[in-house]
């Protein structure tokens, strides 16, 4: 699998602290090895067909599509409570 960043994703990522960005990159490494890695808690995002969400930490999620052997990272944002 490979990762592709959708337009604007990296700009959204820059809004977070270096600590959060490091956590994000760690989670992406888990994603590349195993979509079902326990710390990702990856699941289909219920409001949009075909879009998945995974955890960076308790409060931050990233959203992605799976097309063939590519993860397309769409957005990263604070999870609403």
Regions found by a protein language model. Give the residues of each.
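N-terminal first-folded block
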Residues: 8-39
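Intrinsically disordered regions, especially transient/low-confidence alpha-helical propensity segments
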Residues: 1-2, 49
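A short, surface-exposed loop/turn module that caps and links secondary-structure elements
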Residues: 30-54
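Enriched for short, Lys/Arg-rich terminal
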Residues: 2-7, 11, 18, 22, ...
